[in-house]
Structure formats: structure tokens, C-alpha cells
């Protein structure tokens, strides 16, 4: 289906010249002179070769028609991740490189959308946010409040994030899955 180039995001699948590409990075650039454009870093689904393309923001591109299945994450074994289709209860094992950097945020029972083309899984769309517990947080250094100060903290999955000074170990926080940043304290 044809969509505006500026709606393309990381994880989307683009069809160009009969080839399928998964977008690994999308940056909108606004130069001082001329119109804005979007720079897409992509990986060929079949060969794995990386390429980049540039489109004007008002240009249309062909987004690949994919089969989407709602699945639940079951378990990980090495770099293989097993999901269960919520309709057919069929189990599917997906390699870690298909999931991408977000695999560290997978939790038991997490609901995801698996996109596949001709039966082969191409990408896994994780929820935008995930709630995790902080297991270790540095103490607050007094007197550094002239600017917004953040301190490093380690989450239960081993990921390091920067959190505000009032957040301590044991606190549950909401994290943005796409870039791994702190959003807010969990409301539970």
C-alpha cells in the first residue's frame, strides 16, 4: 500500500524494486535551505545487505503488505525466542536478529504483533512502553540541581537507564521500548 514517506518508522517493511527492506533507522532532516526529507537506513530481508535511501517527506513509498499475527511471548532459549499465536495456539520460534534491539524488553506473556511475508517472520512489533523494576540506583549527589539532573539506574532486565533523582531501587518505572528512556513512575 502507498503511504507518505514521513510515516515510515523503525521496524516497518518497505517494498522497492521487487525487494523487501526492513527499516532499521528513520531520521527526518530539515536542512536550512530546501524542503525536509527523511533518511531511511534499511536492511534487505533476503540477503541482509544494508542500504540507505532518502525521500522527500511528501513523497509516497510502497509499504509491503504483510500478514500480522497477535502473539504472546513464551520463553527465550539462547538467541531463539518462542511466541504463541493467540488464535491458533501454534508456537513459532523467531531468531533474535529479527526482533532487534527491543528483545531485552520482552517479558513472559507480553503481547506483540509478528509481521510475516509468505510464512517467514520479518519483524516483531513490541508495545511502545514496558513497566520494569529498578534493581540498582546510584545515590543522589546533592547540589547538582542547577540543571535537570538524572542518575544512572539498572533495571531488572539488566538495561541501564537515566532516571530522576527521586526514583530509587525497588521502584517500578515505565520505559520507552524504542529508545530505552525513562518516561514516568509506574502507576501501580
Swiss-Prot record:
InterPro entries for this protein: Elong-fact-P_C (IPR015365), NA-bd_OB-fold (IPR012340), Rib_uL2_dom2 (IPR014722), Transl_elong_fac_P/YeiP (IPR020599), Transl_elong_KOW-like (IPR013185), Transl_elong_P/YeiP_cen (IPR001059), Transl_elong_P/YeiP_CS (IPR013852), Transl_elongation_fac_P (IPR011768)
Alphabetical UniProt keywords: Cytoplasm, Elongation factor, Protein biosynthesis
Highest taxon, organism lineage: Bacteria
Secretion signal, residue range per the UniProt entry: none
One Gene Ontology cellular component: cytoplasm
Protein localization: Cytoplasm
Chief place where the protein resides: cytoplasm
Pathway membership, UniProt: Protein biosynthesis; polypeptide chain elongation
Pfam families: EFP (PF01132), EFP_N (PF08207), Elong-fact-P_C (PF09285)
MF-aspect GO terms: translation elongation factor activity
PROSITE patterns listed in its UniProt record: EFP
GO biological process, one term: peptide biosynthetic process
Family per record: Belongs to the elongation factor P family.
Task performed by this protein: Involved in peptide bond synthesis. Stimulates efficient translation and peptide-bond synthesis on native or reconstituted 70S ribosomes in vitro. Probably functions indirectly by altering the affinity of the ribosome for aminoacyl-tRNA, thus increasing their reactivity as acceptors for peptidyl transferase.
Name under which the protein is recorded: Elongation factor P
Biological source species: Rhodospirillum centenum (strain ATCC 51521 / SW)
Amino acid at each position: 500500500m502507498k503511504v507518505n514517506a514521513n510515516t515510515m518508522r523503525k521496524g516497518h517493511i518497505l517494498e522497492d524494486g521487487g525487494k523487501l527492506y526492513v527499516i532499521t533507522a528513520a531520521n527526518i532532516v530539515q536542512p536550512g535551505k530546501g524542503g525536509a526529507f527523511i533518511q531511511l537506513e534499511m536492511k534487505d530481508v533476503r540477503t541482509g545487505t544494508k542500504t540507505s535511501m532518502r525521500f522527500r517527506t511528501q513523497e509516497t513509498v510502497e509499504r509491503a503488505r504483510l500478514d500480522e499475527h497477535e502473539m504472546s511471548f513464551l520463553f527465550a532459549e539462547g538467541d531463539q525466542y518462542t511466541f504463541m499465536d493467540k488464535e491458533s495456539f501454534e508456537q513459532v520460534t523467531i531468531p533474535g536478529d529479527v526482533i532487534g534491539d527491543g528483545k531485552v524488553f520482552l517479558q513472559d506473556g507480553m503481547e506483540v504483533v509478528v509481521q510475516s511475508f509468505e510464512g517467514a517472520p520479518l519483524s516483531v512489533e513490541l508495545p511502545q512502553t514496558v513497566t520494569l523494576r529498578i534493581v540498582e540506583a546510584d545515590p543522589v549527589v546533592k547540589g547538582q540541581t542547577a540543571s535537570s539532573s538524572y542518575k544512572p539506574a539498572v533495571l531488572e532486565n539488566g538495561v541501564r537507564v537515566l532516571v530522576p533523582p527521586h526514583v530509587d531501587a525497588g521502584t517500578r518505572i515505565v520505559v520507552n521500548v524504542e529508545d530505552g528512556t525513562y518516561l514516568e513512575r509506574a502507576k501501580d
